[in-house]
Amino acid sequence: MQLKDFNYHLPPELIAQEPAHRRESARLMTLDRKSGEIGEGVVADIAEYFVAGDLLVINDTKVIPARLLGRKETGGKAEVFLVRRRDEAGQVWQCLIKCSKSPAPGSLILLSEGVTARIVERSEHDTWIVSFSPEEGFLDRLEMIGSMPLPPYIHRPANVIDGERYQTVFARERGAVAAPTAGLHFTESLLQKIRARGVDILPLTLHVGLGTFMPVRVKDLSEHRMHREYYRIPETTAKAVTDRKKAGKRVIALGTTTTRALEHAAAEDGSLDAKEGEADIFIVPGYAFKTVDALITNFHLPESTLLMLVSAFAGRDRLFNAYAEAVRRKFRFFSYGDAMFIY
């Protein structure tokens, strides 16, 4: 399978630069993956697509203000972008570093609020291992010195509104450097409407990491190596998934990140145990899904691994037909864009 098989034309004006006026006011495209039938509505009415006995699994990761501005000891400007936590305390991180010259191990970058970043060593994917000091309370200081890591296709600086809207209402566990964007559409009242239909809503955690920003660099997808992302599935969620699969009920994943965690952790029969690990699963067409029966997701970038995952779930031709229709109907794309419900 070739990278070019996942390209499509997207007019730049359809890339959402701002969130919808209200979370649940985003448009919703529905796609029946068996018939290919396409429908249209709004996210506010998504509860209508749930039935009693369904399980909705959400990702409760919380985006950290991962973009840090500072200066090198020589006075030159430097930008540090947190990618992945490398220790339990949250002091050591894998980072992208942008400055005039490549940093040297042992050198310092001076940030605000008395925080310093010491370059430890070079790591994978053009990143560096960086140790931050003071050692205690670094994650708390991030709220003061960092800014929201908006994706590069949003052509404006992060603002106060992004601090709220580039975060799900159920975000709990700090560690993501990008939002699980399908969840951005949901409000507490909408979740309550879904529960009222006899649906359980349970969390897992997957910290969205470096791969969100990394393009696929190979033409032949069999040569691609997926990035790793930390995840944790609690006992209550694992048991609920297992019970639904045994009973023939639906497991609905809110987002591709939730899907990756579930599919990485699941046994062949779809059952789950509580688990903590790193997901590096690369899902492309031909993959047999073990747990997920329906998927809520946004519209994804051409040639991205997320688009490949959704193509595997919906069928490539059906999905690309839906994307062409979304372009024709002027849906909004990517992180702050509209949503799909694929069943």
Curated annotation (Swiss-Prot):
Tell me the Pfam families matching this sequence: Queuosine_synth (PF02547)
UniProt-annotated location(s): Cytoplasm
The EC code for this enzyme is 2.4.99.17
Q: Which InterPro entries match?
A: QueA, QueA_dom1, QueA_dom2, QueA_sf
Predominantly, its location class is: cytoplasm
Question: Is S-adenosyl-L-methionine one of the keywords UniProt gives this record?
Answer: yes
Q: Which reaction does it catalyse?
A: 7-aminomethyl-7-carbaguanosine(34) in tRNA + S-adenosyl-L-methionine = epoxyqueuosine(34) in tRNA + adenine + L-methionine + 2 H(+)
Describe the task this protein carries out.
Transfers and isomerizes the ribose moiety from AdoMet to the 7-aminomethyl group of 7-deazaguanine (preQ1-tRNA) to give epoxyqueuosine (oQ-tRNA).
Write the protein's name: S-adenosylmethionine:tRNA ribosyltransferase-isomerase
Q: Tell me what gene encodes this.
A: queA
